């Protein structure tokens, strides 16, 4: 710990003065060495120690303590208690502050602790001084004017809200403090000769508090107090009641005030039961329930004003306000807090470092980017503290003076100024790169949108001009129709209450939107769909700002809406899904098949389990988000049709599991659980998926065909306060499951659920005992029910029930059957279905129900399983048609060529149905489409079922 020669004269002079004062005689040598080092770096430490003999004498004992913050308040309170006038109190406050600041500076310059410890001590010291000064002055004011009370006579406190770095627990060395004063209720003082209003009492108290901390005396000052963040700023009252504060933030609160309020913290809050009421009141203003993308533009405007100030004042070397400085790191963190804090509790923390950690955990930024930000923040904050501790001055501008530059470099551990400057520039460059990527840079020269796209919006009241632009400049074939659509859209918007901000955003957005739409060859499809969506969200400015601020989201919106009216309608109905368009990589990359359950659990974990309504909404939102990603990947060609169905099926299974869990909790809370479960794991309950979900073949609009099973014996009851029969419990459970699935909330329904495939159909038990299910399948089920069983599998349930179901299914499917009878029954059922559902469009081929279509292939696969499983038991293994045909080849039942043709026909027609679903089109095609495949299917049908009805 040595000083370079240019700094030695200053240090030697300080040491001479110290030796003359005599206090070094009592210091250990190690401390003297440290003092000599610090004397070359910090004028503040030297002058404070020389001026305060009591400090100089007690410094060795102080510095031997690793931490002092725990005792700040008790020690200061004791000293203030003895002060009966302002002069004495002000002196105590300033001496206390200076002594503790020397301790902190000493630890900083000798690198004896972490940045976090330094910031914590600085923040705790400020809070202790604010709160104990308030307590001292409150007592004096009560003696003079009485105690402020509410209508019930209860004493009223003044709560002091610390803003900015003070609130965040990250105060810098020579920071000012931003405060807001408030009190719970209006009323009058009691106990004095003359009462005054609470507002008057607290205003006087606030003025005295500010004076005690801010006024310059012989001993200096404590903190510069800034009250400009209060409602109405300098023109507003110094103190406001809770009610007035709430009215202001609800009606007039501005974006920058939301930004400022993120770090707000009540000083000494543990002393006030009234704190919780204030916290609950302010939270909705700061953290919106919806994803709030307006924050980006607001923060960008603030950054623009700051940058202008930097240029105007020539603050080019400012490590706080300059490009890549501390403020940009704060903005990056607070963008995510303001946008997503309403939905992500982890983002509601005040401290910047813990917020960055939450951003990393939520994967909102790349891990490397967060690491750069954390490293830069710690580096720049340490540099800022040392810079300010040199002379106890509030500055973030790097010095021009060479001696000061060298002192700062040495304090930071460098031997040369240039090395420090290089590292500062590297850190700030990395920060600015992240900032520009996320928030944008007002310095960037953005290429103007082509003139005709601006005119297309500006001239939307003039049909001739619009049509000319569409026809001549954009070469649109349907110019007249599109012109009408644009003009009508703008006319409709004129009737809506958009507000000035909404119209401003819309005017910026529309030319960009037209540019994206007309870049696509299918613009005539995209334009009406996107305009319809915008019409639905026009009054919700945050969504317009999302599209305006994120070109990638705008591009994906146009692409998806142009490709699929199904998606455009989904986005228009549930605009919360627009959030998914921001990151194309995530949008076109659906969740891994084996991760749907985990992702859903994590998605639901943020919502209290007892909040049934929010849980139901969250289930629907998760399904919509995942379905959007699957459809986007489908459109992009990332997923083939079978993989699309796999994803939709695994998604449905994850949701079934979550719904059963929710329903179980709700029913068990009321009735307890069936007692036969006490000595075993699981719920004794199963959901069997039939049809498309059973065969891993779900489509975008598929229902869920399910059967509920349980293994509850008779004469079993529940163990709750309200006891019911065990089988009645499972009935209530199934009813609750169906309710959760089918209830229409603000986010729609979850799935249409069909339980008619249960034993005895709609007249049978809603939940069937597994032994009764087995008996029914063996003795009473029709052939078509056994056909349905081919495509049935357990999608939720205990291992025991799964084993039982698999056994029953295998035994039933592998029963010997009379071939001729089976052929006739299968063919007859198919003929009935075709008569009822097929051939409704004589000029079109219905992909599912017409001859040679998907249902023929499914019936053929089911017939072959039922007919040959007795001698080929492996045929019962699979529930999906593709693997059934593969097994038929492997077992020698069907020739490979025929099986491959049927598989190709099946997947091709399913693919077409998927595509037409995305386009909101019926599942039919022209009669000349898929002719060869249809003929192959019909030929196979004739060969295997030999029925005169075909």
UniProtKB/Swiss-Prot annotation:
Alphabetical GO biological process terms: regulation of glutamine family amino acid metabolic process
SUPFAM superfamilies: Nucleotidyltransferase, Nucleotidyltransferase substrate binding subunit/domain
Official protein name in the record: Bifunctional glutamine synthetase adenylyltransferase/adenylyl-removing enzyme
Catalysed transformations (reactions): [glutamine synthetase]-O(4)-(5'-adenylyl)-L-tyrosine + phosphate = [glutamine synthetase]-L-tyrosine + ADP; [glutamine synthetase]-L-tyrosine + ATP = [glutamine synthetase]-O(4)-(5'-adenylyl)-L-tyrosine + diphosphate
Organism, as annotated: Vibrio vulnificus (strain YJ016)
CC cofactor: Mg(2+)
Region (Adenylyl removase): 1-443
Highest taxon above the source species: Bacteria
Origin organism lineage: Bacteria, Pseudomonadati, Pseudomonadota, Gammaproteobacteria, Vibrionales
Enzyme class: transferase
Gene (UniProt): glnE
């Amino acid at each position: 710990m040595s000083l370079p020669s240019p700094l030695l004269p200053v240090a030697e002079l300080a040491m001479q003065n110290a030796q003359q004062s005599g206090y070094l005689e009592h210091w250990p040598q190690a401390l003297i060495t440290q003092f000599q080092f610090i004397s070359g770096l910090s004028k503040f430490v030297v002058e404070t120690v020389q001026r305060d003999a009591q400090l100089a004498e007690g410094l060795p004992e102080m510095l031997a303590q690793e931490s002092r913050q725990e005792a700040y308040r008790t020690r200061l309170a004791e000293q203030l208690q003895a002060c009966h006038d302002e002069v004495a109190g002000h002196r105590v406050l300033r001496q206390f502050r200076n002594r503790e600041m020397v301790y902190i500076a000493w630890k900083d310059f000798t690198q004896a602790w972490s940045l976090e410890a330094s910031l914590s001590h600085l923040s705790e010291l400020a809070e202790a001084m604010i709160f104990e000064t308030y307590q001292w002055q409150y007592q004096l004011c009560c003696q003079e004017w009485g105690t402020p009370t509410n209508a019930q006579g209860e004493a009223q406190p003044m709560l002091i809200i610390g803003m900015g770095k003070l609130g965040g627990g990250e105060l810098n060395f020579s920071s000012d403090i931003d405060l807001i004063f408030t009190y719970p209720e209006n009323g009058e003082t009691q106990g004095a000769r003359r009462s005054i209003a609470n507002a008057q009492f607290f205003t006087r108290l606030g003025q005295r508090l500010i004076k005690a901390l801010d006024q310059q005396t012989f001993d200096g000052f404590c903190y510069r107090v800034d009250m400009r963040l209060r409602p109405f700023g300098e023109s507003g009252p110094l103190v406001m009641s809770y009610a007035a504060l709430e009215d202001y933030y609800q009606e007039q609160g501005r974006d920058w005030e939301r930004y400022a309020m993120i770090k707000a913290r009540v000083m000494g809050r543990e002393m006030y039961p009234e704190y919780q009421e204030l916290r609950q009141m302010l939270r909705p203003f700061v953290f919106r329930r919806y994803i709030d993308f307006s924050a980006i533009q607001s923060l960008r405007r603030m950054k623009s004003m700051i940058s202008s100030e930097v240029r105007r004042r020539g603050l080019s070397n400012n490590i706080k306000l300059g490009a890549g400085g501390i403020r940009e790191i704060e903005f990056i963190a607070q963008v995510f807090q303001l946008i997503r804090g309403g939905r992500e509790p982890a983002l509601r923390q005040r401290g910047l470092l813990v917020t960055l950690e939450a951003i990393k955990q939520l994967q909102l930024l790349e891990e490397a980017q967060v690491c750069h930000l954390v490293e830069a923040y710690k580096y720049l904050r340490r540099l800022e503290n040392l810079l300010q501790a040199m002379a106890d001055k509030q500055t973030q501008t790097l010095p021009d003076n060479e001696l000061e530059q060298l002192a700062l470099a040495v304090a930071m551990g460098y031997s040369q100024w240039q090395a420090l400057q290089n590292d500062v520039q590297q850190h700030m460059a990395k920060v600015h790169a992240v900032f520009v990527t996320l928030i944008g840079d007002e310095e960037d020269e953005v290429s103007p949108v082509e003139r005709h796209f601006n005119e297309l919006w500006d001239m939307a009241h003039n049909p001739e001009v619009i049509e000319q632009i569409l026809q001549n400049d954009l070469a649109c074939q349907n110019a007249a129709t599109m012109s009408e659509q644009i003009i009508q859209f703008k006319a409709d918007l004129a009737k809506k209450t958009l507000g000035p901000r909404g119209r401003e955003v819309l005017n910026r957005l529309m030319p960009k939107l037209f540019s994206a739409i007309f870049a696509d060859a299918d613009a005539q499809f995209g334009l009406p769909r996107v305009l319809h969506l915008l019409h639905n969200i026009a009054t919700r400015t945050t969504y317009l700002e999302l599209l305006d601020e994120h070109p990638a989201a705008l591009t994906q919106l146009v692409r998806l809406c142009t490709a699929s009216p199904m998606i455009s309608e989904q986005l228009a109905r549930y605009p919360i899904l627009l959030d998914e368009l921001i990151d194309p990589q995530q949008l076109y990359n659906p969740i891994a098949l084996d991760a749907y359950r985990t992702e859903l659990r994590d998605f639901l974990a943020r919502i209290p389990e007892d909040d049934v309504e929010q849980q139901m909404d969250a289930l629907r939102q998760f399904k919509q988000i995942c379905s959007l990603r699957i459809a986007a990947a489908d459109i992009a060609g990332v997923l083939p049709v079978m993989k699309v169905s796999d994803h939709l099926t695994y998604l449905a299974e994850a949701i079934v599991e979550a719904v059963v869990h929710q329903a179980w909790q709700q029913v068990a809370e009321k009735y307890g659980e069936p007692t036969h479960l006490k000595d075993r794991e699981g719920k004794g309950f199963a959901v069997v998926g039939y049809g498309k979900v059973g065969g891993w073949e779900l489509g975008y609009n598929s229902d869920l065909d399910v059967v509920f099973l349980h293994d509850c014996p008779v004469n079993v009851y529940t163990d709750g306060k309200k006891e019911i029969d065990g089988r009645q419990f499972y009935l209530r459970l199934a009813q609750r499951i169906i309710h959760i699935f089918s209830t229409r909330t603000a986010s729609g329904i979850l799935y249409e659920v069909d339980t008619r495939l249960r034993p005895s159909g709609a007249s049978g038990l809603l939940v069937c005992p597994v032994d009764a299910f087995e008996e029914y399948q063996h003795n009473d089920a029709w052939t078509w029910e056994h056909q349905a069983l081919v495509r049935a599998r357990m999608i939720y349930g205990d291992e025991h029930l799964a084993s039982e179901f698999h056994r029953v299914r295998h035994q039933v499917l592998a029963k010997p059957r009379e071939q001729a009878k089976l052929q006739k029954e299968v063919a007859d059922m198919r003929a009935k279905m075709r008569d009822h559902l097929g051939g409704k469009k004589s000029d079109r081929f219905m992909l599912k129900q017409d001859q040679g279509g998907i249902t023929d292939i499914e019936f053929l696969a089911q017939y072959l399983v039922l007919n040959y499983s007795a001698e080929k038991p492996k045929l019962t293994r699979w529930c999906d048609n593709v693997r059934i045909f593969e097994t038929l080849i492997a077992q020698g039942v069907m020739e490979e060529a025929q099986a491959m043709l049927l598989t190709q026909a099946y997947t091709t027609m399913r693919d077409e149905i998927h595509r037409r679903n995305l386009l909101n089109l019926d599942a039919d095609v022209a009669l000349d489409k898929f002719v060869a495949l249809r003929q192959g299917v019909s030929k196979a049908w004739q060969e295997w079922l030999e029925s005169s009805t075909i």
